[in-house]
Amino acid sequence: MNRWAGRILGGLGVLVLVGGAGLVASRVWGDRVAVVRIDGVITEGRAPSFWNEGSGAAESLAELSSIRDKRQVKAVVLRLNSPGGSAAASQEIAREVEGLRAAGKKVVASMGDVSASGAYWIACSADRIVADPATVTGSIGVITRVPQLGSLYRRMGIEEEVVKSGKYKDMGSPGRPLTGDERRIFEAMVGDVYGQFVDQVAGSRHLPATRVRELADGRIFTGRQGVEAGLVDSLGTMGDAVRMAGSLAGIKGKPQVVEVRQGGWWPRGDKGQERPAGGESTWRLPGGVMLMMVPVTG
């Protein structure tokens, strides 16, 4: 009796394991909308650290590239909750999004609390942009900061000697002010990246560059103001963005949704519902002092 019971239970165990795997597969694979989240300050490489929340370009690029060849994924929602960050990292992520579109996938950018500057640059690479009415967006512009710590060094008795191969090799050193030539070099660099940003917005939003420059003075907009200015397509929630993505991709009925993250794909619920708002409604700047010596959007 015990022997037969063991066999029956063993058989049930196999059924449960196989059936369970089939259930998960049926929920994760098929015609899907994938959600990729970009949260916090956008940085080059990997996210800053365990303590400093942000989106590293390496992680975001890996997540996006993992979708490109997945035939079951017909559309992507970019959930953006970021004040911006590195200009180069923002460009790299935007290019990867454009690659998804070239591969035939529809992409909708969904803006959370904040989707400004570098995050807006990324949003412009999508087919559609959806924002909440109170979303903070815009901030189209470029900034670089050169800290001046010379007086602090002197008070602390710190002196430095510089040996350099060329007159500009220590350009931006915190121990001394910029020279006139150095300032002009920085201004030209910022101006060049700014022009690239304007071109990205003008091309994707089908706006004249002159109009974009009127808006691109660093000012921020609410989501509703963004729609009026032509920077955002429509107002709506993340759920609205998911439904829009599914519709653009020709998915019948309510789309099933998977979250794409480093280490795997995760179903977002039997009906593709959102996670509680508290899980996606905040962003934090990295702690400590950041000394940015390259153009950054933020």
Residue ranges and their predicted role:
Residues 1-117, 124, 128-131, 143-298:
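N-terminal organellar transit peptides
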Residues 134-142:
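Active-site loop architecture of trypsin-fold serine endopeptidases
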